[in-house]
């Protein structure tokens, strides 16, 4: 009892006062039945191929292709984490605006992947450039490295397009 004789009500439990998470995508395996889930799976597949192809070319131009490797590896793991959170149903337990987080993630990765695609295409276009380190003037990229970089450029474009489609879908969910 307080000095005035009236009892003070207990403070509200903070666990009950949080609003529910805002997410319109389904949690669990149902995420794979949506366009967004399919695009995330394609992002992981194509992004992994970009990572593997650039690494298998022995990264002849580390200044350009180092960024491509960083973006593809980082986006690959964050997309796996993103998909894993939806598959496990953790999005229903974490209070966040998942629609905004989905949009912000795909916007950021789209911008970075677009830059990585441009750098990979630029590295591939240097195939006919000759090195001045030898008297014979060997090309900067061997024919094998050139072919691998062409494939990496194509898959980087496809991955960028998938992130762009996911960005459009996320924008529709975030701002209906």
Curated annotation (Swiss-Prot):
Superkingdom of this protein's organism: Eukaryota
Summary of the tissues where the protein is detected: Predominantly expressed in kidney, lung, and liver. Also found in thyroid gland, stomach and, at lower levels in testis and small intestine.
Keywords, alphabetical: Cell membrane, Cytoplasm, Glycoprotein, Membrane, Transmembrane, Transmembrane helix
Pfam families reported for this sequence: MARVEL
GO molecular-function terms, A-Z: structural constituent of myelin sheath
Cytoplasmic side: 1-34, 88-102, 171-176
GO biological process: myelination
Record's subcellular location: Cell membrane; Apical cell membrane; Endomembrane system; Cytoplasm, Perinuclear region
Domain MARVEL: 31-175
One GO CC term on file: membrane raft
Topology term for the membrane: Multi-pass membrane protein
Stretches in topological domain Lumenal: 56-66, 124-149
Transmembrane segments: 35-55, 67-87, 103-123, 150-170
Residues the record marks as carrying a glycan: 132
Annotated function: Member of the machinery of polarized transport. Required for the indirect transcytotic route at the step of the egress of the transcytosing cargo from perinuclear endosomes in order for it to travel to the apical surface via a raft-dependent pathway.
Family, as annotated: Belongs to the MAL family.
Self-association state and partner proteins as the record states: Interacts with TPD52L2.
PANTHER family reported for this sequence: MARVEL-CONTAINING POTENTIAL LIPID RAFT-ASSOCIATED PROTEIN, PROTEIN MAL2
This protein's name: Protein MAL2
Originating species: Homo sapiens
Lineage: Eukaryota, Metazoa, Chordata, Craniata, Vertebrata
